[in-house]
Amino acid sequence: MNNIVARATVALERRRDDAASTPLVRDDAQRSIDVIQTFQRSANELDLWQSSYAEPPARPAALNINGVEISVFPDALALAQVRGDDRVGQVFIRCTIGQQGDAAENRRAEANGHLATIAHIHATHYLTHRGTPHAPTSIVLDVSRQQIIRGPANTARRIANIEMACTMIAALWPSA
């Protein structure tokens, strides 16, 4: 993970310091650097170093759930060894601030839980060559809230809910 963060920071610093870049691009680069630094502090405080991390595939295959195609672009792969078993999951880093209040926080928590579950489903389809897909190894790191949301150990209920939602979406949205 440190190599990924270091490469991203160097690229952003180049963009920020490039006189040919527009003020908007330079400002965006600086804000991205600030987010990366916040992420690093969060990663240290949340003890994310139980796993090793690798770059995800450049063009991950789409996930098709009951006729709905879902693009899944993780920020990293998580690789862990538990009791001699190589486990794999996907990592999503969320840096959005979002709204305050209990209702907004509940929606955010639910969305992060669904994202962690979708990451696990995607891993079961496309990452078995890297290890055994393991739901708790797929995580969403909510940087602004300094929270880790892991895929649930028992995924059956959440997967059934996602499948049902996709069935409804496929029935309602006309296909091209």
PLM regions with names:
Residues M1-A176:
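Electrostatic, structured charged patches in enzyme active sites and in nucleic-acid/phosphate-binding
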